[in-house]
Amino acid sequence: MFEVRRLQINYKTLEEFQKFREFGLEELSMKEDLEANIVENDSESPFYGIYDNDLLVARMSLYKIDGKYDRYFQPAQDYYELWKLEVLPDYRSKDYGTALVNHAKSFGAPIKTNSRCRADDFWLKMGFTPVKYNLMRDRGENPYVWLPESVELQD
C-alpha cells in the first residue's frame, strides 16, 4: 500500500506544490495555504502527501477544527475539515486519493469536506454523506461529512 506522510512546512514542499500548479486545477491549489503557514511559522503541518519514488503525486490539506466551532456533529466536538485533496493526472485511478481519505479517517474524528470539481461520486464512494444545505452555516459550500460510530449529525 502507500505511505501517507505529513508534509513539512518549508520551501522544498513549496517547490513540490509548484508541480501541482502546472498540472492541477486552480480551485485545488494549496500553494497560498502553504505560504501562509510558512509565514506564520506553524509547526503543525495540515498537509499530507504520497510520494512515488521522490515525486509528490497526491496531497491533501486537513485542518483540525475546535469543537466550539462545530455546527455539524452531535455531540459537538473537535473534527477535521478536509479542505483540499488532489492527485496528479498521471497518477489518478491508483487509489492515492482513497489512501489519503482513509488516513484522515484513521484519526477517528468526524470529517467535513466540500465537494469540489464535481467530485460528488468520489465522496459518496468514500462513505461520506451530503449534508442538508443550511444557508447560514454553509454559505455557498456543498458539505459532505463522514461520521465515525457514536457521532450523528446536528438537526
Curated annotation (Swiss-Prot):
Sorted UniProt keywords: Acyltransferase, Transferase
Source organism superkingdom: Bacteria
GO function terms (MF aspect): acyltransferase activity, transferring groups other than amino-acyl groups
Domain N-acetyltransferase, residue spans: 7-154
InterPro entries, alphabetized: Acyl_CoA_acyltransferase, GNAT_dom, YlbP
Pfam family, one: Acetyltransf_1
CDD domains: NAT_SF
E.C. number: 2.3.1.-
Enzyme class: transferase
Annotated disulfide bonds: none
NCBIfam families in the cross-refs: PRK13688.1 (NF010241)
HAMAP family: Acetyltransf_YlbP
Name of the protein described by the UniProt record: Uncharacterized N-acetyltransferase BBR47_38600
